[in-house]
Amino acid sequence: MIFLLIFSAVLFVLYAYVGLRFVMPMDIQLGYKYLICFALFIFYCFPILGIILYFNKIENNLSTLIHWLGYTGLGFVSLLFFIQAGADLLLLLKSLFAKGHSFDPHRRAFLGLSAKTIVGSIAGLGSIWGMYNATKEPVIKRVEIKIDGLPESLKGFRMAQITDLHVGSMITGKFVKTVTRKIKELNADMLFFTGDAADGSVQSYGKHLQSLAEIHPKYGKYFVTGNHEYYSDMNGWLQLIEGLGFKILVNESQNIIVNDATIMITGIPDRGGGHFSSFHKTNMEKAVGGMNPSDLKILLAHQPKDVEHALKYGFDLQLSGHTHGGQYF
């Protein structure tokens, strides 16, 4: 409830600012301004309604439409907000430092409307580009990791990582099947899934992950929870993911023998997991306790902020998700 109130308040500021500073100064008839502001209010309501539906586990075609409308609109308005705020800041600086001069009010009105048309077009195109990037076929990013003292038998060892699939009303099985195909083509020795598998219930969206069962790396596949695993039927999702062949690491480690070398894979729950289950509270002592010396130590942690644990316990590599590659929305 508190989250919903805070979210609604922040959104209200965002949409109200766009209405007051972008829409109302337009040189158009007042009735059109009110109509645009009314549309803004409707789109303001969609994300809030989407969250209410999400937490009440109402998942159907109508809820999917509301999610698409709400978050597409939010992306568009957020871009407008930042562009308009930047323009207002420049105008403020100009008013403070520039000397006053006469101007043609008709010319100013024309330039103002032209500027808003350009800004609106940029925000619209940016939103379309963002939605395209969010739903297009995923791109494999290849990274060569250099680790000092790595045994010869581990050089060339291939690991694949997926994270933050967020299957649900917007990301479906079609997308996951593409991910599965690309991973199989890599023929990786090991697969890691660093959390946030889904948004919603297992009953509605569990089917979208089924293709991941087709991936069979030689040295196994491993999963750690993200924050979204705890928002809807945590146990149900973990049971499904385990059924797909993943070893779920909850404050535990696995020693994997590769030729004559040993890889230690340690997995910890999301940093917020302890708020939902005492068993899912991060416990590094438990996670690394009793493990034998290894040639390569890998930490799986959903949030990059857990790097403090990687440093403290001498891990060679940390794999995380959560940030969506720096995507702000």
Question: Which sequence ranges carry the predicted segments?
Answer:
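Non-catalytic terminal accessory segments
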Residues: 1-135
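Soluble catalytic domains of enzymes that build or remodel membrane lipids, polysaccharides, and related
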Residues: 141-142, 146-329
